[in-house]
Amino acid sequence: MRVNALLPLSGLIGTALAACPFADPSALGRRAEGGEVDARQRLKEVEVDDNGQFMTTDFGGNIEEQFSLKAGGRGSTLLEDFIFRQKLQHFDHERIPERVVHARGAGAHGIFTSYGDWSNITAASFLGAKDKQTPVFVRFSTVAGSRGSADTARDVHGFATRFYTDEGNFDIVGNNIPVFFIQDAIRFPDLIHSVKPSPDNEVPQAATAHDSAWDFFSSQPSALHTLFWAMSGNGIPRSYRHMDGFGIHTFRLVTEDGKSKLVKWHWKTKQGKAALVWEEAQVLAGKNADFHRQDLWDAIESGNAPSWELAVQLIDEDKAQAYGFDLLDPTKFLPEEFAPLQVLGEMTLNRNPMNYFAETEQISFQPGHIVRGVDFTEDPLLQGRLYSYLDTQLNRHRGPNFEQLPINRPVSGVHNNHRDGQGQAWIHKNIHHYSPSYLNKGYPAQANQTVGRGFFTTPGRTASGVLNRELSATFDDHYTQPRLFFNSLTPVEQQFVINAIRFEASHVTNEQVKKNVLEQLNKISNDVAKRVAVALGLEAPQPDPTYYHNNVTRGVSIFNESLPTIATLRVGVLSTTKGGSLDKAKALKEQLEKDGLKVTVIAEYLASGVDQTYSAADATAFDAVVVAEGAERVFSGKGAMSPLFPAGRPSQILTDGYRWGKPVAAVGSAKKALQSIGVEEKEAGVYAGAQDEVIKGVEEGLKVFKFLERFAVDGDDEE
């Protein structure tokens, strides 16, 4: 029996108060400024509108560029054709190196609004006034796949946020999982080399179901915690909108007078958490590789701007090792029982990019982009990222001036002595670009904690010790937290993790690597190891109970809470062009869309009122499937055979929707469609009856999102 042994520890955690007991308004400067903010206003000066204009060269002359200059109608193209050379040359250089990780992504602009004046916990300007707004840009991504890989590959997902604050850019470069695979950044190349495609044949793409990945995971036990999260629904979210975000590392927040606390950053989705199931994600990768980026784009374009709340966990500096692990260890998360989440503000993504390359591809996030009031810790993974992210941008952009790209420019302006370099965009008036200098009158002046609201390192931070190449012994426990995570899932979610590990490990060809996997799993849970061993045809290991416990924590399960909103979820209405069914489908669509759902009517061909044909439709595109009255005719007999769609496609859509845990329904006589695929009307998440009754049921079912009763759990088939 499980018991919750994680109890709140009163008195240990500082509380964020929306009031500042010591703030001097005259010292706060820009902090007090507020007002409405346009998410893309800063980019308008570099927008180019071709409407009503003639074609020009890159240097501004009007041209015709559809035909190259030749010697006669059938002659050679002339070398002097600068128009041809410029057009082809520019095309040849349109791409920059893709990110070595997080190459596949999508982004959006938005606004962050502070819920209060949080100057009692941080000097950060963007958190210094109630209702203060700050423009943001967020880039969501997968980690391992190339830029052309599928959105729904099982992976950790990037959640990188830039705040364009009035005191410089601040980036939270996080993921949708609160922990990471390694503890020391020096092992990052090893991690990525292991999960990337094999260097001999470039296979597999965006997948870890291969020998090298699991060789690394089973040889590097620090990876197990993140691995368990990735094997759960967190690795295959329903959309970017339906996942949380985490800063991963422990940072510091510092007040104006130098008082500091340790902090963990959290983004909490206001859409609710939701995930796909594995087969659904696999099929979706083939049916619509752009599913997540299309979902984000469509939601924003339709006025359904997604939002998240920014929350923090605050910890006293002297409590870094008070909870049984080290807060400097990025493979550990801080259970909410020890430090409750304190919500600071809300972010809404309300503008899509105007140009993917100029904005989403060229934005250059860095953990080193911090502002006054925020500081680093000695987390060894964070320390390495501070170097690596800057270095990779130098590689991608072939020089140091990538911060001058419009998407990277701070709204606060840039004044320093950095000069020249490839792609220099500024014309600097200061010819005495060095400091100190009498000739430039001391400008740009030095800013610090007391003058000019400059960045300052936390007062009192010290570092000393014997030089060595090792990790602290406080980082050594690699098994307690993965077990805590697994214990905290519902039984079906646990089964999903087991099934995912079975799937991945079954692709491993080396027998010793498979045995190593079982050995590591056994240190987390003998039950997990035994259940995986059965699928691999291997002998189960004996229990290794050193780290076994029955503790649970809250906030890690995806499926045990109903969605707070069903707006923008997608419903497929199966119909037919025969017998008046389309009229019934249109009525269904009208009613469902009143509640913010996105409804697609499907039939044999694109008649009036049909949004998609059966030949183009698939259950992966919908969160619920409803059969309109009269459409039962396409589920059996001659109606199921048509040259307009693959044989049995209507039944396949309904069956897959049911198998993948979605709400399924039938109106009136269409309940015969449910019967034809062997689905009982009384099952959870199955609705049949009159239109109003079905609509009510489907909308309630969408809040549940996935009906876990439909998924088998190990032992269910035992008598």
UniProtKB/Swiss-Prot annotation:
GO terms for molecular function: catalase activity; heme binding; metal ion binding. Pfam families: Catalase, Catalase-rel, Catalase_C. Disulfide bonds: none annotated. It catalyses: 2 H2O2 = O2 + 2 H2O. GO terms for biological process: hydrogen peroxide catabolic process; response to oxidative stress. It is an enzyme of class 1 (oxidoreductase). Its EC number is 1.11.1.6. Residues 1-18 form the signal peptide. Induction: Induced under stress conditions, such as H(2)O(2), paraquat, cadmium, heat shock, uric acid and nitrate treatment. This is Catalase-3. The gene is cat-3.
